[in-house]
Amino acid sequence: QFARRVFNKFVMAIEEGFDENQPFFEQYRKMWWNIWHFLQENPTVLSNMNQYKSLLEFIETCKEMEHSCWDQFCLNGQAANVLANLEPRILFLLSLDTAIVLASDNKFLGIAVTDVVLESVIERSWRAIQK
């Protein structure tokens, strides 16, 4: 289905160039920028994601992220005592979701942000998920 394709493209974008041998912050920063750039290059994905969030099938598809790069990152970070002991879904809301929210504000509300501001958001959202 189309919803699954949208979701899979999104997950693939997060994982692009990901290197689990990098320090945890650098891994996080890479995923954050991957999301930001993907949504800037594919702005219709934001509209699609907003439409699909209420569909049961999309919710089930999101649950399939359990073996994703993000989930593994969370498990590894928790095992290393770096990340808070919260579900990966909650950690995502506190961190990488900021890229989606800002991209959405940019597209739908015309609110532009500089790279300096985005780097600050990355650092602050990283602190939000640290132990």
Regions found by a protein language model. Give the residues of each.
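Hydrophobic/aromatic-rich alpha-helical bundle segments in the mid-to-C-terminal region
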Residues: 47-51, 78-124
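Residues in soluble alpha-helical coiled-coils and helical-bundle/repeat scaffolds
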Residues: 19-23, 40, 54, 82, ...
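Short alpha-helical functional segments enriched in proximate histidine and acidic residues
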Residues: 13, 17, 38, 128
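Amphipathic alpha-helical linker/stalk segments
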Residues: 1-30, 47
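Amphipathic alpha-helical packing segments from all-alpha helical-bundle domains
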Residues: 5-11, 30, 34-41, 55-80, ...
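Amphipathic alpha-helical segments that line or abut small-molecule/effector binding pockets
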Residues: 22-40, 44, 89, 93, ...
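C-terminal alpha-helix
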Residues: 73, 124-131
